[in-house]
Amino acid sequence: MAEAAAPGTTVTTSGAGAAAAEAAETAEAVSPTPIPTVTAPSPRAGGGVGGSDGSDGSGGRGDSGAYDGSGACGGSDACDGSGDSSGDSWTKQVTCRYFKYGICKEGDNCRYSHDLSDRLCGVVCKYFQRGCCVYGDRCRCEHSKPLKQEEATATELTTKSSLAASSSLSSIVGPLVEMNTNEAESRNSNFATVVAGSEDWANAIEFVPGQPYCGRTVPSCTEAPLQGSVTKEESEEEQTAVETKKQLCPYAAVGQCRYGENCVYLHGDLCDMCGLQVLHPMDAAQRSQHIQACIEAHEKDMEFSFAVQRSKDKVCGICMEVVYEKANPNEHRFGILSNCNHTFCLKCIRKWRSAKEFESRIVKSCPQCRITSNFVIPSEYWVEEKEEKQKLIQKYKEAMSNKACKYFDEGRGSCPFGENCFYKHMYPDGRREEPQRQQVGTSSRNPGQQRNHFWEFFEEGANSNPFDDEEEAVTFELGEMLLML
């Protein structure tokens, strides 16, 4: 007879009990298999005693044996007496989620599967491809280089073609063998021709000395049209090609086009002035416009060359040095007098006209011919002709009119020259100064005293050199404008 067992202990059965257990197992095999459930073992220490099959009954954990809900070993075939429970039998079939990420701290004692084949997720590790994967063998992704797309495609096509060939050979036998033989011979002959032609690559036009390089022809759908009526798409493509031909090649216009005669764009005619292929062969307006622009540019270049030619040997009449041969490149400038054609460098003539040892009538006159000049115009080139000098003076005045007068100071100060000042008199809001009306009796009262007062004011400013910038220091002398009042 079976003895009643206390909870948490193992039941020992007799022969009749074993027969009853076998009958129960047979009934369970015939009945539908239920969904397996996991029953937590009893938390009591030493949950069972050793069974007849060698189980040590250390119990309490899932690795102590196969227990049912009452804590008794079912004595099934799964129990081998080594302490492996049915809970471990199904957990070992589940991959450990922490092992997938390489962070399982249980190691070999983990109840779940640590199979490498289950861990791989089928995705190649991008850090392994870069050579910087910190997980190493513990990484859950594959550490292998994937096949290239071309190789994979070729492998797939080869497999499909081999399968198709095997199936066709099994079904098609007879007259097709002779036909396939003829086709194979023709393919072999064509392949031999291609190989023979490829051996002659050393004689290509690219390697022949003295021959112009012509790039490969750009593939076009209209080069080999299908026989038959021309479709609408083909006509549109031909029209587009014609319109493209009307455009000049930008690479040929500035140098050399690598496509040469095979370029889809139009290569223009050579211009005699600039030496570039920029003249459209069919656009007369474009040709005339470009030629006119080249002529204007050529005239400017010639004027520049002539100006340098007549300026390079000019000697200053004060320091007796060639202006273009001075040690300081900033001193390669001329001080051109408005009413005189004598040559002076800008530094010397400014020093002469700012001297205080002589009267203003003497210092404002030419050191050689004593002709009084109202202006000293800085210039990088020597100008002697009257018309050219007038143009230079006009440009000089226009340049000065764009600079604000430091004496007017946007309305906060007072400029002694008034409307005769070359500099700009403008308020902060953008308004220009309106000329002031002279009061009756003020213009004729002792004008000499007023002139002397202004002269002393500007001579003091000239000596203090208020212009800090070198460019502004050589542009204009305010003291010279007294002669215009």
Swiss-Prot record:
SUPFAM superfamilies the UniProt entry points to: CCCH zinc finger (SSF90229), RING/U-box (SSF57850)
Biased composition (Low complexity): 1-32
Any single Pfam family the record assigns to this protein: zf-CCCH
Biased composition (Gly residues): 45-63
Protein name: Putative E3 ubiquitin-protein ligase makorin-4
Pathway: Protein modification; protein ubiquitination
Cross-referenced CDD domains: RING-HC_MKRN1_3
